[in-house]
Amino acid sequence: DAGDAVVDYIEHVLFASALPPEEVAAVMLEPIQGEGGYIVPPPHFLPRLRKLCDEHGILLIADEVQSGVGRTGKWWAIQHWDVEPDILCSAKGIASGVPLGLMVARQSVIKKWPAGAHGNTYGGNPLACVAALKTLELVENGMMENAAKMGEYILDALAEMQARHPSMGDVRGKGLMIGVEF
């Protein structure tokens, strides 16, 4: 599939002729591409990319700013492919649009980051923290399951419309992260 072709290209073309893997610190991606049209990757792409990163000691960073916090029916979109990133970043959805960011990482990554190495002058905003707590409460009380259920319903309805309307192109998505081409 296309995902295999991309990973093969990275390994056999980019790494072989343009950029040695030992010079690559990390691969950062959106598990479901947001601004590019809600592009859902082929089934084998993320697992193969995870394996490639592991083979070369490259960190895999998941940008879940748009796709995270239950929007796709799972806490994080990358979970649809049973892939665990080394670092995961999120924002927006974690506090229902109130400015707040989140970064989590494997212990093996965090232990290399000394205490005090990361800080800011505007952290701990009480409003953002309350918004995040309420958002997490909603997610834990069925929002994520509802996103999965409603996403299936909407994708099925769009597929039926697509069969009747030739102006509709591709219909794709996970949960409530849905894209339609016209």
Label for each model-derived stretch:
Residues 1-182:
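Conserved N-terminal phosphate-binding loop of PLP-dependent enzymes in the Aspartate aminotransferase
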